[in-house]
């Protein structure tokens, strides 16, 4: 069947392009010699014009995601891993963690406030933890802002974005849905956190190779879509599924 052959051709081209990319990186000229030519030949991912550090915000958060300070980035990743292991593998519950933290805090304050009497010293002021009044309001505003920005981004891709941007978003959402069906919410958050701390730095290091590979995939998709359109889609009558106007 022609449709089956087209699908097989698409899969075969994906494998061939990936193999060619690996072989070029191994046997081709050096990366620094080809950087200018590759940059001018391929479109950047999501048609961006600015460096990846600027796209990520350009501040301390971007430095952490791009591992500008390896100690801080590694500490953040290890902290997230410890939390995930604590809740997922050890089956520790959030309520238990909060209660134990409050218990340790109360014991520490009790010892601090009463130690001066046992040691015959002047009573020192016990430090207290007080959250700012606007803390939760600022957190809610920040979360709502990011959610609205994500929704606006997806809607712009669906209504105004080109085919490359749309396909990247569709593939990303499909992969997220597959991962979500196999893991719980905490594991999905951890996978997303690890991806956010590894994929940007890997993309920055292999930026031209990734952009070139994606550009070649889009070109292959366009060619196979034209074959599918001329061989199958164009034969479907345009008014077959339309509703007839009634006076």
Curated annotation (Swiss-Prot):
Transmembrane segments: 71-91, 92-112, 166-186
Pfam families reported for this sequence: Reticulon
Any single GO CC term annotated in Swiss-Prot or TrEMBL for this entry: cytosol
Compartment(s) where it occurs, according to its Swiss-Prot or TrEMBL record: Endoplasmic reticulum membrane
A GO biological process held by the record: response to bacterium
Disulphide-bridged cysteine pairs: none
Residues covered by the Reticulon domain: 61-247
Keywords recorded for this protein, A-Z: Endoplasmic reticulum, Membrane, Transmembrane, Transmembrane helix
Membrane topology: Multi-pass membrane protein
Protein name: Reticulon-like protein B8
Lineage, top ranks: Eukaryota, Viridiplantae, Streptophyta, Embryophyta, Tracheophyta
